[in-house]
């Protein structure tokens, strides 16, 4: 592999990792806010879809330039195409993380059954965060067996988030049936948690 090409690949990987770190940081702040029951601190999540999209476009341009200049072979071509997909997914995840923080903060109130909500929201967020961290760590992995193990770990965590969301959805629907006056607030909480489940 040509040295300039290898350098370009490392730069692209580094930029993608930085987007991932920004999204992970936002999710960690959200987790800390929920664990400490300081929901107002969710407003401190400073990740924006616009900034992520700009960064993603820069990475996409780097990838396209690399494709044009170096005409990579099949394996390297697949790697570059996967980088395009990864940046797109990280932007989507970052957007969902920001939407979660914004919607959860807006709809969370002491009128709701906060202990039940947090009982499921915290593990849901923790599982989504672990899945994202593991996914990002795969970028630097070169051992095929370790990649496979991490991939399976991601699948397990995503399955956990699905299960936790279904459990909280069922419990919130029960709460709504008992207290129709708060149905909008509960649905808003559910909507915010749905964003988290999609991270």
Regions found by a protein language model. Name each.
Residues 1-199:
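Cytosolic, long alpha-helical scaffolding segments
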């Amino acid at each position: 592999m040509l040295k300039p090409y290898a350098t370009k690949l490392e730069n692209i990987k580094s930029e993608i990792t930085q987007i991932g770190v920004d999204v992970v940081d936002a999710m960690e702040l959200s987790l800390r806010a929920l664990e400490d029951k300081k929901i107002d601190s969710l407003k401190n999540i400073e990740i924006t879809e616009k900034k992520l999209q700009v960064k993603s476009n820069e990475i996409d341009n780097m990838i396209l330039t690399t494709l044009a200049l170096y005409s990579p072979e099949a394996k390297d071509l697949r790697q570059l195409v996967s980088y395009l997909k990864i940046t797109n997914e990280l932007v989507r995840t970052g957007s969902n993380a920001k939407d979660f923080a914004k919607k959860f903060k807006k709809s969370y109130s002491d009128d709701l059954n906060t202990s039940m909500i947090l009982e499921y929201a915290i593990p849901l967020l923790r599982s989504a965060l672990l899945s994202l961290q593991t996914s990002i760590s795969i970028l630097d992995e070169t051992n095929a067996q370790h990649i496979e193990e991490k991939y399976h770990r991601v699948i397990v965590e995503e399955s956990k988030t699905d299960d936790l969301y279904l459990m909280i959805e069922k419990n919130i629907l029960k709460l709504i049936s008992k207290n129709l006056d708060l149905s909008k607030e509960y649905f808003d909480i559910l909507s915010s948690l749905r964003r988290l489940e999609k991270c």
